[in-house]
Regions:
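Conserved Rossmann-fold NAD(P)-dependent oxidoreductase catalytic core, especially the SDR/UDP-sugar
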Residues: 1-37
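Active-site loop of short-chain dehydrogenase/reductase
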Residues: 3-8, 20, 60-61, 93, ...
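Hydrophobic structural elements of the Rossmann-like NAD(P)H-binding subdomain
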Residues: 9-11, 65, 84
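Active-site loop/turn elements of alpha/beta-hydrolase fold enzymes
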Residues: 13, 67, 99
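Flexible, glycine-rich beta-alpha linker
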Residues: 17-18, 35-39, 63-80, 103
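Short glycine-/acidic-enriched loop or helix-start segments at secondary-structure transitions
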Residues: 19-21, 74, 140-142
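Active-site Tyr-X1-5-Lys
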Residues: 19-22, 35-63, 85-90
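C-terminal substrate-binding subdomain of Rossmann-fold SDR/epimerase-dehydratase oxidoreductases
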Residues: 82, 88-171
Length: 171
């Protein structure tokens, strides 16, 4: 309040909702309850609630966005797409958690930024906005697409033990 900002946009994740079943006709909505399944998603859900509490207590102009998986320029190198590209270009094994059938909705970073800009200028204070790409792919399909695009062999795929609390699908 002291800085007189016109609006605070809190960037969160769809992981705070937990896991969807594999029926691709259902998606998270702004009324889906928070059900995080990992310490990471629990920390994000906690931060969402903290932001909401500050907004209510101090009458702050706040929006919360919950987006799906981003991809695009300058992504952190440990994320699936840049990691896969780096490993393949160096003829190293690409780790795939479990059977690779985890489904993610992919959203280009430009589209995410565009949505944030719209919310900044037209969003209703206090609202939560879900931002998705309606572009669901399994992790294995993403990796195979990159491998084939670069012209390498699927023998570079190495299935590794799945992470604890790893949601099968969120979108």
């Amino acid at each position: 309040k002291q800085t007189k900002i016109s609006k605070f946009i809190h960037i969160s994740t769809d992981e705070v909702y937990g896991e969807l079943d594999f029926d691709k006709t259902n998606f998270f909505s702004d009324t889906t309850p928070l059900q995080p399944n990992s310490p990471y998603s629990a920390s994000k859900a906690s931060s969402d609630l903290l932001v909401r509490a500050y907004a209510e207590t101090y009458q702050l102009p706040v929006n919360i966005t919950r987006c799906s998986n981003n991809y695009g320029p300058f992504q952190f190198p440990e994320k699936l797409i840049p990691l896969t590209i780096s490993k393949i270009l160096n003829d190293k094994k690409v780790p795939i958690y479990g059977n690779g059938q985890n489904i993610r909705d992919w959203l280009h970073v430009y589209d995410h930024c565009t949505a944030i800009d719209v919310i900044l200028h037209k969003g209703i204070n206090g609202e939560v906005y879900n931002i998705g790409g309606h572009n669901e792919k399994t992790n294995l399909d993403v990796v195979k697409t990159i491998i084939h695009t670069i012209g390498k062999s699927e023998k570079l795929i190495e299935h590794v033990e799945d992470r604890l609390g790893h949601d099968k699908r969120y979108a």
